[in-house]
Amino acid sequence: MKNEINPKETKRAFAFEMWMTAPMPMVTLVKTMDISKLVKISKKRGFKFNTLMCWCIGKTASKTEELHLLPEDGKLYQYDQIAINVVVRNSKGGINSCDIPHTEDLQQFNRDYMKLTTKVAEECQSSFLDGYMIVGTSAMIQTELDCVVNQYTDKFLNPMVMWGKYRKSWFKTLLPVSFQFHHVQMDGGDAARFLEKLQQTIFSL
């Protein structure tokens, strides 16, 4: 559910006043993640790596207070549900968007992920959810990337998590992960904590 709230009654009051009308309010932080466990689980249990990564992002976001807030059209909104948006390569060679509701049940999330993305790919039609806080993702696995800085548009102020191809070594598999967020939504320290919590979610899976 989506509810408008008074920013002056939240701890984001100062940030809302400072950044709501800023020409470039988006910030990007990058952290290199140890994803060895995700790769191992993907191979052992048959999950797609992207499914596991998206589930970990959703699980971490659902426990992050700031990621339930979103500035939009000069107002501040609070959401009680999280969904993950993925970019899907469709059957015609183009791309579409697909929103997947987060659930703590990994098996259910996997079923939803496979069902919804398959439908979007086959029908070449994007699928969106209303009333959910959407955390965007973009996986550009064609090459290794050190950092991804998303283009700012006032049509999409949602947080976004982006990555490229992961890097294997003898003992670890590493992945630089870029996290873009709106400064009204959170401060740099909050974003850094989100990335650290995401790493811990991956470790604990």
Question: What is each stretch, according to the model?
Answer:
Residues 1-22, 83-89:
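Short amphipathic alpha-helices and their capping loops
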Residues 2-3, 22-24, 82, 95, ...:
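Conserved GHKL (Bergerat-fold) ATPase module
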Residues 6-8, 20-52, 66-82, 97, ...:
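Gly/Ser/Thr-rich phosphate-binding loops and adjoining beta-strand/alpha-helix segments
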Residues 30-32, 85-89, 98-101, 136-140, ...:
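Residues in well-ordered beta-strands of folded domains
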Residues 38-63, 175-194:
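Acyl activation and transfer enzymes in specialized metabolism, enriched
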Residues 90-145:
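Helical lid/core segments from catalytic subdomains that handle acyl or acyl-like groups
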Residues 121, 198-205:
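A common structural junction motif
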Residues 150-180, 184-186, 194-199:
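Intrinsically disordered, low-complexity linker/assembly segments
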